[in-house]
Curated annotation (Swiss-Prot):
The protein's name in its UniProt record: Chorismate synthase
Cofactors: FMNH2
Organism: Chlamydia trachomatis serovar A (strain ATCC VR-571B / DSM 19440 / HAR-13)
Residues annotated as binding FMN: R123, A124, S125, G281, K296, P297, T298, S299, S300, R324
Family: Belongs to the chorismate synthase family.
Pathway involvement of the protein, from the record: Metabolic intermediate biosynthesis; chorismate biosynthesis; chorismate from D-erythrose 4-phosphate and phosphoenolpyruvate: step 7/7
Length: 357
């Protein structure tokens, strides 16, 4: 397995959905950063299950700091964080151990390893992303110390979608964080879709934006900013697509329609538009970073689907009623996308400081 992400500022996540705990080890964090268990509460709450229109699994997701912090200051040594699994219910998975669950990683894991822990998805479960969000809290603290702000929000839910990238502001952050869906979309329309389709699930899109980034983040040629972001976002469970700036729509434009014109004023050189998404040649250029991540519908639904037992016998598979699943994983993925954005930017920020004497 490849459980590490990052170069200078790196994380290693561990644990399974129905194990006693999950966690993450962060290496490369500078010393002297203020950090306490309370710092993790807001971000963990945004990803936590058991809330409106998310999985009913009740996990407090309290973060315990095991190492790397003394007197609420990081020491520069590896930081180890632990999150206990408090609400594990494996009984519904016992009856599923002899069949393949459509859309789940079980078939792939068993084919690769010959054996797999399939309780709640095991290592492939989105439960693993709680560790990423915890690590992202530390990354965000570093970014804020450098006056870099980031935000992710739900920009698509089923057929509802907005492709606009708003300008990042304190009021926008507040609006997203106080929305039950972390979105700028009409909440009533999302609720109606959920009420009209109680046995089905929905896909979604999560957008991310930043304040203007410093020029120079990104390491050509294989460590380009968009390339690393694509890898980070596509590593999130259920992620199915990634774009930066105009993305796929740029393939339908002419060059004259796509190009961002350079302009200059008393503050310096900038772009008149931002269809490039904030990077040229894979390097940040002083513009806001803008991108989107597409998520598939949740695979666990109450409607029947054809499958087979492990001996090849055809069956009509239906998710057990006692199973606990999200109607749309993109809602809780908002916090995960923001965390992976923060982790990527901090790593590139530290790498960039090595490029010039």
């Amino acid at each position: 397995m490849h459980n590490q992400y990052g170069s200078i500022f790196s994380i290693t996540t561990w644990g399974e959905s129905h194990g006693p705990a999950i966690g993450v080890v962060i290496d490369g964090c500078p010393a002297g950063l203020s950090l306490s268990p309370e710092d993790f509460l807001p971000a963990m709450a945004r990803r936590r299950p058991g809330q409106l229109h998310t999985s009913p699994r009740q996990e407090p997701d309290l973060v315990t700091i095991l190492s790397g912090v003394y007197q609420n200051k990081t020491t520069g040594t590896p930081i180890s964080l632990l999150i206990e699994n408090k609400d594990v219910s494996s009984s519904s998975y016992e009856q599923l151990q002899h069949c393949y669950r459509p859309g789940h990683a079980q078939f792939a894991y068993e084919g690769k390893y010959g054996f797999a822990d399939n309780r709640g998805g095991g290592r492939a479960s989105a439960r693993e992303t709680a560790s990423r969000v915890a690590a992202g809290v530390i990354a965000k603290k570093i970014l804020l110390s450098q006056r870099i702000e980031t935000l992710a929000f739900l920009s698509g839910f089923g057929t509802l979608e907005s492709k606009n990238y708003p300008k990042l502001s304190d009021s926008l952050i507040q609006q997203v964080h106080t929305s039950p869906f972390y979105t700028l979309l009409p909440q009533e329309e999302i609720q109606n879709l959920l009420l009209l389709n109680p046995d089905d699930s929905f896909g979604g899109v999560v957008s991310f934006i930043t304040s203007p980034l410093p020029i120079g983040l990104g390491e050509p040629v294989f460590g380009k900013l968009p390339a690393l972001l694509a890898a980070a976002m596509m590593s999130i469970p259920a992620a199915k697509g990634f774009e930066i700036g105009a993305g796929f729509s740029s393939s339908q434009m002419t060059g004259s329609a796509y190009l961002d014109a350079f302009i200059a004023d008393e503050s310096g050189v900038s772009l008149q538009s931002n269809r490039c998404g904030g990077a040229l040649g894979g390097i940040s250029i002083g513009q806001p970073l803008e991108g989107r991540v597409a998520f598939k519908p949740t695979s666990s639904i109450k409607k029947p689907c054809s499958s087979v037992l492990k001996d090849g016998t055809p069956i009509a598979y239906r998710t057990p009623n006692q199973g606990r699943h999200d109607p749309c994983v993109a809602i809780r993925a908002v916090a995960v996308v923001e965390a992976m954005l923060d982790l990527t930017l901090v790593d590139l920020l530290l790498q960039h400081r090595c490029t010039q004497l």
